[in-house]
Amino acid sequence: MKFIAIIPARYASTRFPGKPLATLAGKPVIQHVYEKVSSVVADTWVATDDDRIFNTVEAFGGKAIMTRTDHKSGTDRIEEAIEKIGGEWDVVINVQGDEPFIHTSQIETVCRCFDDPSTEIATLGKPFGDNIEAISNPNSPKIVIDKRGYALYFSRSVIPYVRGKEEQEWALSYPFLKHIGLYAYRRNVLKEVTRLPQGTLETAESLEQLRWLENGYRIKVGQTDIETIGIDTPEDLEKAEEYVKGLV
């Protein structure tokens, strides 16, 4: 199978403008992401709408492509990038540009989901463990899966609701699963899902993947035990710097 990885990265961000170019351990955040992904997927590109990001990627030897500024999601930006890059691809991998600690094994896990020819879309889930505070956090979407590892639903709410137990006991009664926002799609499926109108579930939860479920697409969920640290705010960057120092 032929894989290509696209890292969508835009400069404009409400909470942290320019975060792909923020410096972490002496390198731009986007460079950390690119180096991790390209060590697994030879054909790796950054798709951006900003010259500063484009020039930075080319300066460190990466591949970048300019896209429109009006995309509503990273998935839409990836579809435009693939059309411009050209070539024949079996699977397209979507890695967020603000995930400098994405692990190579996580990318490999998502890729292996496509060993099953019936897989249309794949993503990752990580057990929450007994951290009820994290489970209750609406900024950490939860997944429930079926016996074959396909997503039944994603939600910012705690799913499932554990009846007859105090909230503090929920994590001891059910293995809650956190969604890790790494995606991969069959090439034809990516083209199809970017043409779907926004659905009511997506609007309610503000989770793009619900559009795909609502339209009958199946999402395979690979599992990982590795936590990732996304950079959404300047405070997240400070925490990431402290994390890196702890590794030295």
Q: Predicted segment positions?
A:
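Short, high-confidence coil segments that cap the C-terminus of an alpha-helix
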Residues: V41, G87-W89, D116-E120, Y217
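Conserved alpha/beta core of the MobA/IspD/sugar-nucleotide pyrophosphorylase nucleotidyltransferase superfamily
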Residues: G87, W170-V248
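Conserved core of the sugar-phosphate nucleotidyltransferase
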Residues: T104-R195
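Short phosphate-binding loop-to-helix
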Residues: W45, D51-T109
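Residue-level detector of anion-binding/catalytic polar loops
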Residues: D43, K63, Y217-K220
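A conserved hydrophobic position in a structured secondary element of the catalytic/binding core
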Residues: T48-D49, I102, Y185, D232
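N-terminal glycine-rich phosphate-binding loop and ensuing alpha1 helix
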Residues: K2-T48
